[in-house]
Amino acid sequence: MKLVRKNIEKDNAGQVTLVPEEPEDMWHTYNLVQVGDSLRASTIRKVQTESSTGSVGSNRVRTTLTLCVEAIDFDSQACQLRVKGTNIQENEYVKMGAYHTIELEPNRQFTLAKKQWDSVVLERIEQACDPAWSADVAAVVMQEGLAHICLVTPSMTLTRAKVEVNIPRKRKGNCSQHDRALERFYEQVVQAIQRHIHFDVVKCILVASPGFVREQFCDYMFQQAVKTDNKLLLENRSKFLQVHASSGHKYSLKEVLCDPTVASRLSDTKAAGEVKALDDFYKMLQHGPDRAFYGLKQVEKANEAMAIDTLLISDELFRHQDVATRSRYVRLVDSVKENAGTVRIFSSLHVSGEQLSQLTGVAAILRFPVPELSDQEDDSSSEED
């Protein structure tokens, strides 16, 4: 994401102009735009025209509109963002108050104005515009006949390809059908890797599986690369890291990222930090339950006692339609930071973020036990905030 202009007043009202450059920037934008904001961007509008002879026709024109935002729709697979609202500035083609939907486009700037820019939103802009926050991990999670090729970016886990091939069982004295199907499966996975992984950006490619599938696959891939003189694979061989996974399904990626070998290799990535924080929370819940709590009310009480060491919070909570509720989460984040606590904002599009959402989306590891919390502990997961 490129920051063109930022103009925010002392009362935190103001506007920023940004240019989305990567598909992931649409996800950042989705987390920035809220109902009631005003969005100015280039868009296509179908307009009716009347010729001198009186015949009526229609054509599509490009124009710039400013909308008061009423609805936001994000397609996570296509990374497309549509913003619906009413026109609030005079325009040659669109009446004031008329509805329109802008589909934000890569490499076209937009200007977003808010009455109140909070700290969480401003931090997201800072992160989105920092080139160090780019996609740098890929993963091939596989078992015999099934593979998922994923990109692990700082904000989301994207499934780029799913490969499925029926592998017949080995028969006594005749393994040829099994071996041919397995080779066909491996070849399709290799093709998917070359098609979907940008080797110039990705620092590490995890190949994870149960049993010996990963070793057999990597042996096949590099033997074929030598035979065909595939420089792309041979030059990037050192980036491939083989690790254990319980299955070839996407959910196995969480356990892969928890693997100590992987964690040390990916220690500088946000995704690995999220996974470790959630893992630490679960360990504390098991071994020191008086220092691990989840649910907004419990976590707020812990914060009042200045007991929070690490706050785990899902980014979907900052998209809450109710401004007062959203502000409550922002105040919690600001307060934990002021008290020298660590804040981990989890992406709801990461496997770890999905798990945190099942724990109400907010949890905390405490510096010390808070007796009142332990006494009053109830089923936090039933809270509806």
Curated annotation (Swiss-Prot):
InterPro entries: eFR1_2_sf, eRF1_1_Pelota, eRF1_2, eRF1_3, Pelota/DOM34_N, Ribosomal_eL30-like_sf, Transl-rel_pelota. One of its GO terms (biological process) is nonfunctional rRNA decay. Its main location: cytoplasm. There is a cross-link at K162 (Glycyl lysine isopeptide (Lys-Gly) (interchain with G-Cter in SUMO2)). It comes from Pongo abelii (Sumatran orangutan). The modification Phosphoserine is found at S374, S380, S381, S382. This is Protein pelota homolog. It comes from the Eukaryota. Signal peptide: none annotated. Belongs to the eukaryotic release factor 1 family. Pelota subfamily. Its cofactor is a divalent metal cation. It is found in: Cytoplasm. Pfam families: eRF1_1, eRF1_2, eRF1_3. GO terms for cellular component: cytoplasm; Dom34-Hbs1 complex. Component of the Pelota-HBS1L complex, also named Dom34-Hbs1 complex, composed of PELO and HBS1L. Interacts with PINK1. Interacts with ABCE1. Interacts with CNOT4. The keyword Transcription does not apply. The keyword Cell cycle applies. The gene is PELO. One of its GO terms (molecular function) is metal ion binding. The lineage of its organism: Eukaryota, Metazoa, Chordata, Craniata, Vertebrata. Transmembrane segments: none annotated. Component of the Pelota-HBS1L complex, a complex that recognizes stalled ribosomes and triggers the No-Go Decay (NGD) pathway. In the Pelota-HBS1L complex, PELO recognizes ribosomes stalled at the 3' end of an mRNA and engages stalled ribosomes by destabilizing mRNA in the mRNA channel. Following mRNA extraction from stalled ribosomes by the SKI complex, the Pelota-HBS1L complex promotes recruitment of ABCE1, which drives the disassembly of stalled ribosomes, followed by degradation of damaged mRNAs as part of the NGD pathway. Keywords: Cell cycle, Cell division, Cytoplasm, Isopeptide bond, Metal-binding, Phosphoprotein, Translation regulation, Ubl conjugation.
